[in-house]
Amino acid sequence: MYLINDLEVTKDEFTLPVENLAVWRGDGVFEALKIHDHYPFGLEKHIDRLKQSCKKQLFDNVDFNLVKNNILKISSNHKSGYVRVLILRNESDDDFTIYSFYQPLLNLPEEFTLQSQPAPWHAGGDYEVDSKNIVGSKSTSYAYNIKQTREAVRDGFTDALLINNKGIVLE
């Protein structure tokens, strides 16, 4: 199932314009919720975190009832998997679109290895949640995280374990 705002569309219609600021600036926020027996796990906590991310990224007037209804609609159609929600900036600061979709469960290998990778850009717990700093928001700007994962895979590991400069596991 694919929803743009509250409109159900086909997979082919579930597209993102290249002019969208999320495409060329990474200007967006997201949440991913695990589905357990047709219900999204931790729904209210995810909505609260999404609200915090939107506040930090200056996404105003987001209809969180629409977001919640989309999550419930998608999860009610699947016994397991994930619901992904992206709130992405369009061509101007005041315009955004809410994308919601189902993702099947990820297939994890039987053996899983992690390589520690430094993540100096990542929140290390040394910030105030209510600060205006975007640290601590679930931003779609994941290039740094992906780069560290690629490094770990190239070194023969399954994934990266992101740590801060004190060795504390971040992600």
Regions found by a protein language model. Give the residues of each.
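Ordered, amphipathic secondary-structure segments that act as subunit-interaction surfaces
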Residues: S76-R89, D94
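Helix-start/capping segments and mature chain N-termini
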Residues: M1-K73, D93-E171
